[in-house]
Amino acid sequence: MSQDLRELVRSKVVIGDGAMGTLLAERGVGFGHPYARANVTHPEMVAGIHEEYVRAGAGVIETNTFSANRFKLQIHELEDRVREVNEAGARLARRAADSAETGDGALVLGAIGPLGRPLCPVGPVTEEEARSVFLEQAEALLEGGADALLLETFTDLVELRLAHEAVRRFGVPVLAYKTFVEDGETLSEGLPGRAAREISSLGVDLAGANCTVGPQRMVGIIEGMAAEVGPVAAYPNPGLPQLVDGKVRFRRDVDHFALYGRKLAEAGARLVGGCCGTTPEHVKALADALRNFRPENAPARSVGVRTVEEEEPEEVLDRPATELAEKLKTGFAVAVEVDLPRGNDITKVVEAARRLKGRGVDAIDISDGARARLRMHPVAAARIVQEEAGIEVVAHISCRDRNIIGLQSDLLGAAALGVKNILAVTGDPTQIGDYPEATGVFDTDSVGLVHVLAKMNRGEDLAGNSIGDPPGFLVGSAFNPTAEDLDGEIEKLRRKIGAGAHAFWTQPVFEIGALELALERLGDLDPCLLLGLMPLRSARQAEFLHHEVPGVNIPKPVRDKLSQLSLEDAPKYGVEVAQEILSKAQPLVNGAYIMPPASAPDLAGEVVKAVSTQRSAVS
């Protein structure tokens, strides 16, 4: 039975249903079996659970389709069954809602969850692709009989906006819920209210919060949301989960859930149900607790509905707060990469950094497990070098070894330790390193990591939560002017600039003409570049780099010349080549990034002599 949702929540508190996946798991839908697939493999079980919720008092039920989008079904090789799974889910809920046995009928919400893949620039999914995936699911849900559409458990409001843009064309009511982590700061910083205003400004029929926290913690969230936009929806978990015998379990204190369900209604929730871990017993207790509740009798509240446009945005300036950043703006900066040893003693690295500082180097670069080798964390090494050698460090951060939470945690730690020059890299595959069987995470890539750094420089983490004072990172990334697919490399450079990168460290260049061609092809782009220079030490090294290392091109005349020189004279020639390129390139770039052999970091000092001589021309 279809009803006007907006009118419904004005007149009373409506009871929602509870978890579907929790009960499916308890009743035998095994691990690895996507819950949405049960719509076609276990239809009677799904329909039966819907009916239990309606009998318990739910006036609104959700389809079993939270994870039924193309991307999530693709994990189980079910991407060609999106329409079938969603239509079946809507039909089963519709049947339960309209059953004479279960009462007067209930409203059916077609449930749509997040994509399960990150959006550009953090991940590969474009906005157009995202809308298409949401649209496909919504069409099938409405075809199956859903009365309205529910966008639930979103953390990213950009993704939520894209979902709403995709589904609003159908003219049916749309509800949209964000999930919050309530850790005290969430409330003190006013995030629920800000999120509610942003969600409501999209034009949704009802904003709300669901999942992640229990009913007690959700009360404060709902108070913040309702104070800004009026009536909202609340679907808490019963509490925090625990792992028992390899399975996720929640406490079943239905009285506690019902007690705080009433408090949620008093806080401004007009649609109250349950999320993960809740059961028909929770819903029945909730319905009993709210049976005689009337919104007009709730404690008086100050409610002011505003839109995002009415709020003056706080200006946050993205200003790198490092000496290297200043040097790149006002002069010509020199950075030298120094390799870390396998162990935890980096005394030689510190000593090399001191010597290089004395030769005029502005910063030391420390890689993050380059070529997938086990090394000390670059931030820890950077802190030691900065303290003991008195020179700034550029810490390379790779996306290979940490998920998106770990990456942000490391960056917060870097900021706290004073390591604020960060070079964002995707990372080499584990297959070429010390542990080829290790898992490569790659939640994002270098473009996405640049975006994360830029958000932190605006005082936010990736989810939009405040991190306090912006750290002032210098955001660096890589650019290869000698790439085989130069157009693709330039397009990626453009994306990195758009994501918030300040400067770019190039791959080693051995021919000035290649650099000039790349700069010409950049067109309207004018990136801050540190030119990569690698003083070659032997013909063997040159042949290896040219033939076996992607992205490195060494002209044949240089390789031939090295092959004619002794082991003593070859490094001298390698330095001469680097100096010559630098001399010609210095008017074209903002700095130099010297990569000496791991065993001979002082070779960079010979190149720096030429840099120092040239500096007066640009000072």
What are these regions (language model features)?
Residues M1-S619:
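Domain-level signal for soluble alpha/beta catalytic cores
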